[in-house]
Structure formats: C-alpha cells, structure tokens
C-alpha cells in the first residue's frame, strides 16, 4: 500500500481485526466488551511531514515519503488521502509555489503541515541552508496567498512569519475545549478519534472524585476535560514547549483547579517518595493533595518500573497507551493490586498495525 493512501473499502475489515487482536492480547486481564472507537476512513490526519525529492532530470521538486519496511526507498506522493481536507488543499498550492521560485526551492528538503478542524494551518519549509531576507520577502507573499501561517527553518534558524501554532477546538460531552497546538510540539494526529478518547476518559472517570495526578500531560489535551471530574489536578510534563502550551490552554479555557509541574515521571516519583526536592515544585504542596486517581499517557516505552510502583499506590488508574505490548507488560505488574474494569481501542491510525488503547484499573 502506498504511503498516504486510504483504501476505504477495507476499513471495516481492518478495524474488526484490530478489535480481535486487542481482545486476544488482553484476555488475561479483561474478558468484558471492548469499547471500540472508529476513525473516519479518510482525511483524518491533521499533521503530515514530507521529504522533498528534487528530480535531477526535470529540476522539479515533489513530495515523497519512505516506503515502510523498505530501506532507502522513497516514494513520490501525488495525493495524501489520509490527510485532512486542509492539508490536501494546501499541498498542490505549496508545491507549485516552490517549483516556481528558485529562492523557495533551493536546498528545501522537507515540508510539514499542521492543521486544525477549523481550517487553521501552519506550513513549515525546512532547508539545508540559511534563510535570507529575500527568502522572507517571497515567503511572506506566499503566506498571504495561501491564507495560512508559514514558517521557515534551517539549522539554528527559525523564521515564523505569523503564528507557529494552530488553535484547535474539540468537543467533549457537549463542552468545547480550545487548544494551542505548536508546530514542534506533540499533538494527537487524528482529531476525530482524539475527541472520542477525551470523551471516553471523561465519561469513565465521572464518578470518582478526589484529586487527580496526571503524568505526561503534554499540552493539556486530557487535563482540561478530566479536570471537570476532580477537585484538583496536578499534571506533569517534561517538555518546555508542551508546558508552555498547557499553561496557555488552561488560561484560555478558564480552568482554575489545575497545577502544572515541569518534571519527568521519574523525577516526580522521586519527589513523591521524598527522595529528592525540586525547585520546580517549590510552589506546590504535594502533601495537600488527596489523590484518588492517576492518569498516564506514556510514550511507546510504557511506564518504567518505579512509575509502575507509583501508579500501584492509587485506587484508580487511567492508562492511555500508544503501544499495546508495553501496556500488557505494565498490566502484568499492576494486576497484583488492581483489576481492569474497562478496555478501549481507539483507531488513531487506520490501515496500519498501530493500536491506541485505554484501560481503567481499580484497586482490588
């Protein structure tokens, strides 16, 4: 299958297969009905990155992607069917402008798109050369024509001609949340499925109460809707870019019960265990929190051993996983103290092997 294609006629089959794989993989931990959430069959991806291939015969640039599982094979991309409607609208216009301008094309090696459901968009042009004032003048004309935000980047140089972020609005149980999503920050790529993930997490935690600890909070994606269910939320994140966006998003959404600490999960575990003191926690009294629940959305590596031990101290665990294999490993450890009461599958990446899962664990 060519990268970026959307064979919509196969969607139902591949989704059913993912449900069965998930049921089989977690049968030792859960035997109830899986909460399974579909994706749109096409135009679901809100961000995309393309290599730029310069044809030596024609001199023209084209979009390209690596062929999955085939080393050093680059495939030209004519259409990106899984991309949002806004990405597909922008792609030919951006490429035409690049091919009509020596300044824009010279040593251009990558183009990135970040879009929102509103049509807001950031396009980043990335170069193997310094960017001049002449480049900036031409890029400003292109930005005006495209009606989007344009960024130029090269080594140790970034020129943002407007904003370097989009504003996304997601609907969770009839309430809208607005998010700043920065072009270099992590965001969920499938907005439609992201809304379903947020709604599921908020719904299944509605009756818990108490205070919430969140690790790996990113830009506050889950933090904001979950804060509706808890008295107070303490959220941690190590990325400075994400922390800055999270603080912006908390203010824009009028949330008053959320505190953010820039710590890794390992550092926070040390703080909770009183192994180390952190200046980044000097305005936060950990002992004042009455934590009932921990929420984690870790990277593919899952939770490290110490964080698993930390999570096991909470009555309720909400775990969103982008890697079912490491989730299963972590559940094997947590199963001694907790039982899985809900299991969800979110089809973030149709037509791939990728499965996003969610589990609720309650103390035995």
Curated annotation (Swiss-Prot):
The active site is at residues 322, 356. One of its GO terms (biological process) is tRNA methylation. It is an enzyme of class 2 (transferase). Keywords: Methyltransferase, S-adenosyl-L-methionine, Transferase, tRNA processing. The keyword tRNA processing applies. Pfam families: tRNA_U5-meth_tr. The keyword Membrane does not apply. One of its GO terms (cellular component) is cytosol. Its EC number is 2.1.1.-, 2.1.1.35. It catalyses: uridine(54) in tRNA + S-adenosyl-L-methionine = 5-methyluridine(54) in tRNA + S-adenosyl-L-homocysteine + H(+); uridine(341) in tmRNA + S-adenosyl-L-methionine = 5-methyluridine(341) in tmRNA + S-adenosyl-L-homocysteine + H(+). Dual-specificity methyltransferase that catalyzes the formation of 5-methyluridine at position 54 (m5U54) in all tRNAs, and that of position 341 (m5U341) in tmRNA (transfer-mRNA). Belongs to the class I-like SAM-binding methyltransferase superfamily. RNA M5U methyltransferase family. TrmA subfamily. This is tRNA/tmRNA (uracil-C(5))-methyltransferase. It comes from Teredinibacter turnerae (strain ATCC 39867 / T7901).
